[in-house]
UniProtKB/Swiss-Prot annotation:
Domain topic, free-text comment: The N-terminus anchors the RBP to the virion. The central part and C-terminus probably binds and degrades the host exopolysaccharides.
Designated name of the protein: Depolymerase, capsule KN4-specific
Complex formation: Homotrimer.
Record bears the keyword Repressor: no
Subcellular location per the Swiss-Prot or TrEMBL entry: Virion
Protein source organism: Klebsiella phage KN4-1 (Bacteriophage KN4-1)
Similarity comment: family membership: In the N-terminal section; belongs to the Teseptimavirus fiber family.
Amino acid sequence: MDQDIKTIIQYPVGATEFDIPFDYLSRKFVRVSLVSDDNRRLLSNITEYRYVSKTRVKLLVATGGFDRVEIRRFTSASERIVDFSDGSVLRAADLNVSQLQSAHIAEEARDVSLMSMLQDDAGNLDAKGRRIVNLSDPVADSDAATKGYVDEGLEHTLRFSESTVQPLPPLSLMDGKILAFSGGKPIGILPESGSAADVLVELSKVSGYNLIGKATSFANMRSASGLKVGDVVLLTSYYEGGTTGGGEFLVKAGSAVDDGGHICVPSGSTNIYLERITSEVHLLDYGILTELNGTGARIDMSGKLQSAINRAKSAVMPLVTGIPSENHYIRRGVYIEKGVDITGIKTITGCLSLLVDTRKLVGLVAPGYPDTKWALVNLNAQFNASGIVFGSTIGNQSFDSIVVRDVSDRGAPGAGQLHVTSGTMVKGALCATGFDGPGVSILGSYDSVIPDIRSVHCGNVAQWGVDIAAYRGSRPDNTNCMTIGRIECHDATDRALRCAADLSHVGEIHIEATLVTSTEQSTSATIADNGWGYANVLLQGLGTSYGSVRDLPVTGSVPPVVEVVADDTVVDSLSLPRSNLSLHYAFTTPRGCLSAGTINVGGDIIVTNGANTNIDSITMGGDSAKLTSASINLNVGILRAVGAASSVVSVGGNIGRLECASATLTGVDVLRGSITSLTLLDRNTISRTTAQSLNVVGTRNYLKSGFRVSGPATLGGVNNSASDTVFAGAVALKDPWKFIAVYINGNVTYSGNTTSSTYDVSFQDVFIEGELLLSGPCRIHADNMRAINMRIGQMQTGFIVMKNCTLSGGVEGNYIGSFNVPPIGSITQNFETGIPSVFTTSGWKPLTLA
């Protein structure tokens, strides 16, 4: 022990009592420990040791596992022995104790420093013969290394008993040679040709792979002999001289069917077979070739492709195509002449791109659709003679993209791809091009996500280019709970798209260049009753929402019809610059509703009876565009028909703002508007609207605050009224009306209604900037009326009651003789005197006007 250390001392075990060689201020500053090279135990006073005297302690525990007893002083730097306070007596003894505590702390710190690894006079760290423990493995070349690190490194070296060994020759002299020793010196020698050493040297070269025995093609592997269970066979390439489709095969016991890709059965073998060692099924494993745009040799790969698909299904492996994902502009694909069935497959990685020629294609038939031949089917459900078994759809599939193209471009009737699946995720797109029939059909499917669906040159008068709907069956199972990002139908013929999925969402629909050749497509009541008898786009689905919808047909084509079914359906926007629109009722009880944002239509709109609609705005851009509504619940925020010959015919609902050339309304509330020619039948309420001409022929029509007619008005019907309105032209009254707070800048003519038992006309707070011309049966009630002249002609029956009225001109009319007793209140003018008279119970009395 270094004698310069004063506060730490260690004794060998063996005794029980040990001296304390240093002074201390308190026993709690003395620590007694049992120590060894790799362990230390701090003992407790009284229970594990005790003081024999002030300078001696006695151990009370065994020392097994330890070889030393350590006694050290550890004076507290925070717990003061002497605590000074203001006003206390300062004694020398207290000062000495306080100074001594500080001295002890400094002395102990010096001893700890002396126990640490210090620099010697040369600047090197001196461990003073002690071990350095808990050292990490070295990283840099100059780092210290542990014994374990060094020992492990030596275990991987070639060791000799001699103290020194000469270095190996340069690597340039050792290439292709094996190591040998001559005279104690390492040398390189060439192995004997054909020897095991020679083989090992050759195999160790970069080119050694070429020396390993292997099958040169899948067909060559079938002729292998001498194989035993457990052997591994290396296949260079699927085809002789090729570079793809190779791999390793394990020889297994048993019988199997050779599938031409993953299972190989040697010729004549019945008890062994070779199975490819892999965790996926690649198209190249089966020698499946692709072609560019279908212009190559067109080798039919349908058999190989179906084998690969079947292997992926049975082994539950992903099918890897190795074809980059493409949309409908397909360039490279696998040519097939027979339809393929991917039912039950779980994963397709890469784009499954198929090229077909419908003139040669032997398509697959799906249950319930005997006349449609499909290039690809995916039928994850149970079926019977009628079609699908309700509620049986499964799936849980994952696809990158599936693209099918008819290289003959509608060369013969055919169909692209049909999916019946549930819980499926498509990462890319489902696309079809060039089919005279369905392109992409998703029927009886649920709970799936598809970012993109596209068809080009698909559809006909009987089948939809894209069809998302129910699968046929005794109880049709409708598609529902689908999330579809985008649907695009380009260059469709007649039927472009039907989307009838329930409780689903479609983010965007883009229809372009549709060619409509027929208007005879009414194969269902949904279409037959839509007002047009045909539809090229059909959007429906209980509780389904659509984002933006756009349809732009071929110029010169028969105007296509876009039909939207009010089945609690939501559409953000409809842009149909050259299309007609049908807003149709749903065959549900109670009737559903359509909620739409903005609708822009270049053609006409028909709203069928029972179609409950709530629409933010409708704009009709055609010169003679016409909206015809048979629904009593057509509710529109803004309805604008901008054409000079545009018209609106509606039987009910609410319109926030109506702008059109001509409107014929029944049961409609219009809050504001601008109309050239307005005809009101029954039960209309019009306010804050300007009409250039007005014709009222029905009953219970109410012209309210802010209504204005800038031209002539013909007012017929009964139980009609006008209040707080302006007639800027002449008014022809055909039937009794009630006017309150009305300004008429023209003559008012009332001819009376000889067929009506009630023929009252009421003027209250009315200003007629013209003449009031009365003829025929009438009963006039005027209160606070102003007019220029009142002319009465051939009034055979009736009366006139006037109160607070002003005639700036005068009253003139036929003379009523005593032999012609009129009803009480009748009024006339004595042409001889010019004094107007009114008939009372006392006879004719002069009439005084205020």
